[in-house]
């Protein structure tokens, strides 16, 4: 998490935008078996300029963010690429990887919930609205998972909430 803080502090000079939000932590969804941990995720991060060299896949923007779990269980840092699709109303799918802080014992309330690996896939999607030229609000979903590559047990972990983003340029 310290490295994440340094990256976020150093990044805004080259970032297209910074963002932050609050998301419900470890939400139980029809696709996952969440709800083992309580609290919220406090997220802060930045997104860079579009990568023109990756134009053949839509010129995504790099991002990095840290997520602090208020319940004290599983904090994580993630990095990846995302695509902003649309105008004032937009969708932003993203693909990334995350490293989390949870102990490897994988047992909470006598239920096996291991995440399978310290490093996980971290897909995300948000739906947003550009409030002004510099400010946008997003409804965001972030999923952590090893995609059953490391074991058959893969409950994953979902966070769902709201983010605000601020364009620096």
Predicted features and spans:
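Extracellular loop and loop/strand-boundary signature of outer-membrane beta-barrel proteins
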Residues: 30-32, 65-67, 109-113, 147-151
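Short loop/turn motifs that connect adjacent beta-strands in outer-membrane beta-barrel proteins
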Residues: 11-16, 49-60, 85-91, 134, ...
């Amino acid at each position: 998490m310290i490295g994440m803080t340094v990256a976020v502090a150093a990044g805004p000079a080259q970032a297209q935008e910074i963002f932050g939000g609050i998301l419900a932590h470890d939400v139980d969804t029809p696709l996952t078996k969440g709800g083992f941990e309580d609290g919220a995720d406090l997220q802060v991060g930045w997104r860079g300029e579009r990568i023109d060299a990756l134009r053949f896949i839509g010129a995504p923007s790099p991002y990095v963010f840290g997520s602090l779990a208020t319940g004290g269980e599983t904090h994580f840092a993630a990095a990846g690429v995302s695509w902003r699709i649309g105008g004032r109303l937009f969708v932003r799918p993203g693909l990334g990887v995350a490293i989390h802080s949870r102990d490897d014992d994988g047992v909470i309330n006598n239920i096996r919930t291991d995440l399978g690996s310290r490093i996980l896939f971290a897909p995300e999607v948000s739906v947003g609205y550009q409030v002004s030229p510099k400010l946008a609000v997003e409804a965001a979903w972030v999923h952590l998972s090893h995609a059953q590559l490391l074991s058959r047990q893969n409950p994953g972990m979902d966070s769902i909430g709201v983010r605000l983003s601020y364009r620096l340029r």
